[in-house]
Every structure is written in C-alpha cells, then in structure tokens.
C-alpha cells in the first residue's frame, strides 16, 4: 500500500506570522492547504456553503456570496448560532481538505494550515503540530497595524483562540517568528527536511 504524505499541522494565533511561515513552506516546495482560504471560497460567489448560510441566517448573503460583516453580527455573542454556522462551514472545508490530500497523495509531505487546529479535533489527523509564536508585544503591534483593526477587535478574536502559552505546550514544534525572518526560515527548512524524510 502506498505511503501517504507526512502531514504538518500548522497553527498559531492571530498576528504570530503563520501566513509568512506557510509561504516559506510553499517556497521550499511543500504543498500547503490554507483552511482560511477554503472558508472564503466556500462562502464566496457560488460557494457550496452560501445557500445553507442564507437559509440559516437570512439576509447575510448577496451576489458576492456571504457578507462577512453581516454574518459576524448574526453570530457574535451567540454560541448556538456559531455552532450552526460551524456545522455548515466545517464539512465544506473538510471536503476541500480531502480533495487537497488526494491531489497531493504522491508527495512526501504536505502542510495543513489550520488556524483553529488545536481548538478542535483537527490535530488528530496530522503527524506533527507546529505552532507559530512570537512575543505578545510583537503580536499586538502586527495585528494593530492591520487596516480596520482595533484593540477591542483583537481582544474578541483572542477570546475565541487558545492562549499562545497553551498552544506552545501542545505543540510538537514551536516556530518562533519574533527574531527575524532568517532564524524562522532555518526552522521551517529543518522541518521541511524532516517531513520529507517522514519523521
């Protein structure tokens, strides 16, 4: 039976540099599944989740797919509504991930970039959990430099994510991004080599 690719589960809180690390893995030739991009595609024009979201949350979609602001307002502070939304979106993302894995089944290694990997059962399907991390002051500065981001919005996002210290404790490997790109790239390159070797 053919051996499946070694799976690196890549995760990290907002502003930790996960997107940069994912680009580094791509640069090194590892296919990367981007769960956030899969969510956007499923909720975009013609996306497979749009009709179900409109049925569950009337008025939150339009010609461009889901209106993310309206949907956020519909579920914010309502755990039951959030669970309903997740029950629609998660299966769509899982199908896209399964297609990605089939498409790259002959590769020695792949990366699954999943922001909430450790908040759900996703970590069980990977061979190694890599958590991207940086000092809190660096994280805060990065996030607040984004257009439209406020300290209040940052706090709301962080409230839905495991604390960085907890993620670090659950990680097989921590990828530090607070010391510059070169040290980060060296860690990523080392991990890519290990993954290709199936370790």
Where are these regions (language model features)?
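Walker A/P-loop
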Residues: 19
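ATP-dependent NMP and nucleoside kinases share a basic, alpha-helical "lid"
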Residues: 97-104, 109-145
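ATP-dependent small-molecule kinase phosphotransfer cores
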Residues: 37-109
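Hydrophobic anchor at the beta1->P-loop junction of P-loop NTPases
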Residues: 10
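P-loop (Walker A) phosphate-binding loop of NTP-binding proteins
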Residues: 13, 25
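Small-molecule kinase domains that catalyze NTP-dependent phosphoryl transfer to phosphate-bearing small molecules
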Residues: 96-99, 124-125, 145, 149-199
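ATP-binding Walker
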Residues: 16
